[in-house]
Amino acid sequence: MNTAAGPTGTAAGGTTAPAAAHDLSRAGRRLQLTRAAQWFAGNQGDPYGMILRAGTADPAPYEEEIRERGPLFHSELLGTWVTGSRHVADAVTADDAFGALTADGARPGVRELPLSGSALDAAHGNPGGPPLPGGWPHRPPDREERDDPDRHAADLLNAAGPGQVLDLVPFARRLAARTTGAWLGVPAERLPRFETALTGCRRALDALLCPQLLADARAGLAAEEALRAVLGETPEARGRPPGAVEAARAHAVSAAEPIAVLLCNAVRELMERPAQWRALTADPGLAGAAITETLLWAPPVRLESRVARETAVLAGRTLPAGTHLVVLAAAANRDACRNAGPAVTGFDVLRRASDGGPQPHGLPEDLHFRLSGPLVRRTAEAGLRALAERFPGLRPAGPAVRVRRSPVLRGLGRLPVAPYVPE
């Protein structure tokens, strides 16, 4: 049984996938079959299948089961090798034999997961080349003021009424869209369209490994096309070589929802540790340490998908070209913490600020984030710093709601907080 984790694929941007043929009925059936295959694998005791089921429960127990089975776990039913080992994760990241696309430009799982992935392919089509064709975007000096996540965060929070319950998910998404739009040179008058389209692409990373509902997949395709249209109207798009707009779209999509998830995860971790939140409000400069700890303990991208571009040896196993591999980033980070000694036992902003600790796996080193990783971190830090400065009495105002079918991001649908403690 071969699902999204399997090695089959078609050339990125090709015309053989159901999405290109607009055969939505066939695509919907294929998504249902892939979903059924992942559920069947879970029923047979496959922990990777349980992770891909992606309900609202914490996937950490299944991640740990995979890690405990050795450096490489073979999900036979899903045709994928999976690792929770930090050593193996770092080896995969450093080895050019592994990429997001095969050597001939095929994306693994395109047959099993139609209507997904095309908005991200352009970021990976030339692993050895520049992140974006023509060097876009290189920020000109006169854009310094617009490309300022601290200012964008402050402006958004100024619109929040005093004492009102604030849902951090739309705040984080709007902050991500504004900062990403400025980074890509989207004119102010087009930012509302850009924000709407970018938010509509929020399931793109999850859809690489987990079949989405057909209605959501179709909505995502429409949003991706709307985003391409907006970016094609920017001054930076003029005179750029073919593919530049698609590459810019890929980097926007790969950055935006991870920014929102990272910021929301950081707030959740701190709300669960009031003393650490108080330390942050006393010294907002700790926002960087808090984001690093969040990247370590609650990363915004938990599953990193790779395919062997050529025959490779990993953890003593020979993996033929076309082999699909998934890195469990959160498990790999916990593995690094175990090896760091007894001092690193959990989320601790003050320890990070004073003594450091293991560096999180992913982001700048990950294929999705070689260009956008610094933007993801910088924007999340700005949002967290602004919240600490503006709302030092921030507290939970209801349960957080996790999104289903979100094994990659473990995204949030709602995160209500109260800015002020009632007198």
UniProtKB/Swiss-Prot annotation:
UniProt keyword GTP-binding, yes or no: no
A biological-process GO annotation: antibiotic biosynthetic process
Keyword Metal-binding in record: no
Low complexity bias: start-end ranges: 1-21
GO molecular function, a single term: steroid hydroxylase activity
Pathway linked to the protein: Antibiotic biosynthesis; tylosin biosynthesis
CDD domains: AknT-like (cd11036)
Record keywords: Antibiotic biosynthesis
Region annotation Disordered: where it falls in the sequence: 1-26, 117-149
Residue stretches of biased makeup (Basic and acidic residues): 139-149
Functional note: Involved in the biosynthesis of the macrolide antibiotic tylosin derived from the polyketide lactone tylactone. TylM3 is required for the glycosylation of the 5-hydroxyl group of tylactone to yield 5-O-mycaminosytylactone.
Record family assignment: Belongs to the cytochrome P450 family.
The protein, known as: Protein TylM3
Taxonomic lineage: Bacteria, Bacillati, Actinomycetota, Actinomycetes, Kitasatosporales
